[in-house]
Structure formats: structure tokens, C-alpha cells
């Protein structure tokens, strides 16, 4: 089953840049190792939240607003698509993402298979 991991953390770049250089290097190495994990099909960091646009269509009119759609206040910083044998394996993978232990969250959601 394929799972989407939505990585959310307000101010992630600022928090990481405030860490000592050796800690920044360790976290960077962790992210690189995660990208190389068997089963990772895709993943990337997103550009700054200030570059986001939100698109809605009302009565045939396209409305575009600046900024992200933020339901819970947490910024979407990146994502992974992970092919896991089951939900427990997907959760174990998500727990390895450094943001999960730094005050951010990783939402795990199965992709619909068609």
C-alpha cells in the first residue's frame, strides 16, 4: 500500500538554522538517508509558504488567493510517498522523519489504489 506522508512544521527552516552546525549536518544526513530508504517512491521539501497560492472555483469563476490553505495552522513543508507493507510500517517510517521529534507532525494517509 502506498502512503502519503505530509510533513508539517511551522518555521522549520528558521528552527533548523538556529541549531549548532553539527546538529544541522546530522539532520541533513537523516533526511538524505530517509530519501534512500527502500520503498520511498518520491519526496521533497516545498518552497516557502509565502510562495503558495490557493485556488477555488465558485460559480465558474476561478479565485486565487495568496498563501496556503491551513486548516490547523501547521505549514506543509514537504512530503514523501512510501510503499509500505502495512500501516504500522508506514507509521514506523514517519517516526524517522526528524521533524516529527522537533515539534512538527507527519500525517500518514493511504493513497487510494485504482
Q: Which residue stretches match the model-derived regions?
A:
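Conserved, structured core segments of small domains
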Residues: 1-114
Amino acid at each position: 500500500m502506498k502512503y502519503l506522508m505530509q510533513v508539517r512544521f511551522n518555521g522549520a527552516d528558521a528552527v533548523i538554522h538556529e541549531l549548532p552546525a553539527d546538529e544541522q549536518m546530522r539532520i541533513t544526513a537523516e533526511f538524505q538517508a530517509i530519501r534512500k530508504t527502500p520503498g520511498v517512491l518520491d519526496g521533497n521539501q516545498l518552497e516557502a509558504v509565502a510562495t503558495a497560492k490557493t485556488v477555488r472555483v465558485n460559480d465558474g469563476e476561478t479565485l486565487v488567493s495568496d498563501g496556503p490553505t491551513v486548516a490547523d495552522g501547521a505549514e506543509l513543508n514537504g512530503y514523501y510517498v512510501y510503499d509500505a507493507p502495512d500501516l504500522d510500517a508506514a507509521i514506523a517510517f514517519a517516526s524517522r522523519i526528524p521533524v516529527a521529534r522537533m515539534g512538527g507532525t507527519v500525517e500518514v494517509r493511504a493513497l487510494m489504489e485504482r
